[in-house]
Amino acid sequence: MSLQSSIRADSNCTLPNNPVCVLLPVDFIVAAMASSTSSAMAKWAAQAARGFAAAAPSSGKGRKVAVLGAAGGIGQPLSMLMKMNSQVSSLSLYDIAGTPGVAADVSHINTKAQVKGFDKDGLAEALRGCDLVIIPAGVPRKPGMTRDDLFKINAGIVRDLVTAVGQHCPGAVLNIISNPVNSTVPIAAEQLKKMGVYDKRKVMGVTTLDVVRAKTFYAEKNGLDVASVDVPVVGGHAGVTILPLFSQATPKATMSAEVLDALTKRTQDGGTEVVQAKAGKGSATLSMAYAAALFADSCLRGLNGAPVVECTYVESTVTDAPYFASKVKLSTEGVDKIHDLGPLSDYEKAGLKAMMPELLASIEKGVQFVKGA
């Protein structure tokens, strides 16, 4: 199949610049890049592929993926993006309401993943045999709410869904999106420990949106091609616990202390920026779905044997915090290696110290939610 024939016949879809055309399976884009005789096409394909961490293998075991909370603001676009991932052979979409419509809609996309929708009585079947489970379920942020305000509702949702994962697919890799991630990941870990099926390599909090934002803001400020930019983001996934390491960003750019501080704070407050811009009508659903799809793609490539390094929030000994986001190597069993933080600037050292009280308190809150139940 040619690249041209794979794109919907649409007079508004022209190569190489129309963004509609970018929505192709990553491994297909890489293949097109390799075979194209057009240098412009090759450049376009390479830029599209670099939205993901690294070039995906063109083949690999088809994986069963479940999205829990598939009818929500994040779940719907995430379900579409996972349907487009060529590493997915079976896609289970679960929610307490609205799933049949989402599943029917997504199933019409002409990619190989077979889609099934499940309602509140179908969770066990949705999870059975899954390799990867993504959890965006829960209530979204509203104006004036912090991630911690979501705890009372989302903590119970995550605990109950993770219990089902422990019962029906205990070996699956877990990607937890539901906020507050600083607490919901410890909740997931403690619940799986309680059930005797915890594997620290397979429970990950999705902090990729912080990385995506840091890359975007850094590239914009310094006039760089965002596709060539890398910025590690460590710590947690809320406010001051989000610490972009701009001293380790590539390509290198010289920034004043004022600019550095502004970029850091914008990365930390990115979620609030979107909530306020939507004026009470939503949160960062689209960018979160995009970031979650990037991270899920990396997890799938890791499961299929490709060496992948991503930032994610996991059980860790890198700092005094028992859970911490940093660069990790993903492999066939989940997290294979947790990287050290590397050299930090004085500004970053101060940020690391400042985040600890809040991060530790959020972790303990999650732990006690399960232990005290």
From Swiss-Prot:
GO terms for biological process: malate metabolic process; tricarboxylic acid cycle. GO terms for cellular component: mitochondrial matrix. It is an enzyme of class 1 (oxidoreductase). Coiled coil: none annotated. Pfam families: Ldh_1_C, Ldh_1_N. NAD(+) binds at G69, A70, A71, G72, G73, I74, G75, D95, N154, I177, S178, N179, M288. The keyword Mitochondrion applies. Belongs to the LDH/MDH superfamily. MDH type 1 family. Homodimer. This is Malate dehydrogenase, mitochondrial. The lineage of its organism: Eukaryota, Viridiplantae, Chlorophyta, core chlorophytes, Chlorophyceae.
